[in-house]
Amino acid sequence: HKGDRAQYKDCTYEFTQAFNLASVLGTKNEVRIESPFNDWFKWDICKTGLNYSVPFESTHSCYLGQEPPCGRCSTDIERIEAFYRNGVKDPKYSDEEWKKAVKHMQEVLKEFNNRVK
């Protein structure tokens, strides 16, 4: 998604195009790589998932592999923000854990925004 490009090179258009070219050449055009969410923010992807009733309780993002999610790694922060911006609690968290996760996410984003000013 859009927020990952600077951090992860496999989220760039260039990577997708190169991978797609290799796939097309290697499979005689039988396999194509699509990346429909490249221009979307995570909260936009979350909104679409909510509209399609994606079972988010069955999805996992935490880089530390924790269950419930750690709420501290970068992907958890983005996931928390995505659900928060959509006015929905991430089903991976209890009500109490969600309050703490949102508070931490807001602190992290505030600190980040202060650094980039």
Which residues does each PLM region occupy?
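Nucleotide-activated chemistry modules centered on ATP-dependent adenylation/adenylyltransferase
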Residues: 1-117
